[in-house]
Design a protein with these regions (language model features):
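Leu/Val/Ala/Ile-rich N-terminal alpha-helices, chiefly Sec-type signal peptides and the beginnings
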Residues: 1-231, 348, 352, 363-408
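Extended, alpha-helical interaction "stalks"
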Residues: 207-408
Length: 408
């Protein structure tokens, strides 16, 4: 029966999709209940597994993904007679399953296999800090559950589509469907390889470099606040907005005030972006962090606080968009101001944390202390932030002193 290999391949791929789509689902929430102290042997074991993961398992995973892609003939969109080597597909799929299982076992053994010190007492553990393990778990989960498992599913769909096309070769719709599935599968392959490379880089990079990655991603995500502002700052979309009949007769005052308040967010967005780009793009040899003495608590706070600021600004802007769409006035000025006070405190604490973990390293070309350069930079940002905050409070109160220009 010529369809038997197809059935076997589809069944195996579906089985692996179901298995690996649930992989690591408890990894992020599991806690080790062991009470023994971490030993030198434990550390050696963890470091050995991390080395194996970096130098053997992850490179082999990339090779196996490429092999499965090749056996599925993903790069050939012109072949009108889709004839897959299903024996090779079965072999490559089995190899991919084995390496995934080894990687998951390795990560679980490293992160959960023996107790670690608390987040405030792991500064001496180098690659075995909870901060790094948390990133490793998160990225591995995304790789396995949201990418490689989908590769199994899409591969199964492709084989089924090719089988259907072989049974009805005159139907052009089958060819179109095969091309669509190939394109989607190839995208998953490329993304899986990128994520595998990201895991390898995570194992090689210092704590500071990993925090810089988080900062840079956060800086790029801040555009979401400006995109929300466009909803209330673009007159062309006003005709499509809802109108609350109880607030139509306001001569546009409600929306005009909301637009002014929304625009007063712009300086904060710019200042946060400046801060994040400054510290995320400075080369590590010029970024004088005491990286080997930072524990997980400090690293978590450094990477998390900018995200907290952007999330808070996004929520506030979403509230303004809702008011604008329904033509409602801003009634909770005090609460919004209180929220901005919290954002300001987080901004200050982030700047202070960065300065606190700097050490005085000299720049040979300028003969200046990097600590002082960063310190002055943060002082300037703080002054501009408070000017923007004063301007914001004036605007949200519904008035601005005469001849005062908005801060941007």
């Amino acid at each position: 029966n010529q369809n038997k290999p197809s059935v076997e391949a589809v069944d195996l791929l579906q089985l692996l999709y179901n298995r690996h789509s649930l992989s690591l689902h408890l990894l992020l929430s599991e806690e080790d209940d062991a009470t023994e102290n971490l030993t030198i042997n434990d550390m050696s074991m963890k470091e050995g597994l991390l080395n194996e993961l970096e130098t053997i398992l992850l490179p082999y995973l990339t090779a196996r993904i490429a092999a499965l892609s090749s056996s599925l003939n993903l790069n050939n969109f012109a072949n009108k007679d889709p004839d897959l080597n299903l024996t090779l597909v079965l072999i490559n799929t089995s190899h991919l399953d084995i390496i995934l299982s080894e990687i998951m076992y390795c990560i679980e053994k490293v992160t959960l296999g023996s107790p670690l010190p608390t987040e405030s007492d792991d500064h001496y553990l180098n690659r075995c800090k909870r901060f790094r393990f948390s990133l490793l778990q998160t990225r591995a989960t995304i790789l396995v559950r949201e990418n490689v498992s989908l590769l199994f599913q899409k591969s199964s769909e492709l084989i089924q589509a090719c089988t259907t096309s072989r049974d009805d070769p005159a139907n052009s719709e089958h060819q179109a469907r095969i091309c669509d599935i190939k394109e989607a599968t190839l995208m998953i392959v490329n993304n899986s390889c990128k994520l595998t490379s990201s895991l390898t880089n995570l194992l090689q990079k210092t704590d500071v470099a990993l925090v810089q990655e988080e900062w840079l991603a956060t800086a790029q995500s801040i555009n979401s606040v400006l995109e929300l502002l466009a909803h209330i700052n673009n007159p062309s979309i006003e005709s499509n907005l809802e109108r609350d009949p109880t607030h139509i007769v306001d001569n546009g005052k409600n929306r005009k005030h909301i637009v002014e308040v929304g625009r007063s967010f712009i300086p904060f967005v710019k200042l946060i972006r400046l801060l994040l780009y400054k510290i995320s793009t400075t080369s590590e040899n010029k970024l004088p962090f005491i990286s080997n003495t930072m524990n997980t608590d400090k690293l978590d706070r450094l990477s998390r606080n900018p995200k907290v600021i952007i999330e808070a600004l996004t929520l506030l802007m979403q509230g303004l968009v809702t008011l604008y769409q329904t033509n409602q006035p801003i009634r909770d000025q005090d609460q919004i101001c209180a929220d901005f006070d919290t954002i300001t405190e987080t901004f200050h604490s982030t700047s202070l944390d960065i300065c606190r973990y700097l050490v005085p390293l000299r720049d040979p070309s300028a003969d200046l202390l990097w600590e002082n350069i960063f310190g002055d930079y943060f002082v300037d940002l703080t002054i501009l932030w408070h000017k923007a905050l004063l301007n914001f409070r004036t605007i949200i109160g519904g008035s601005r002193p005469e001849n005062e220009e908005p801060v941007e």
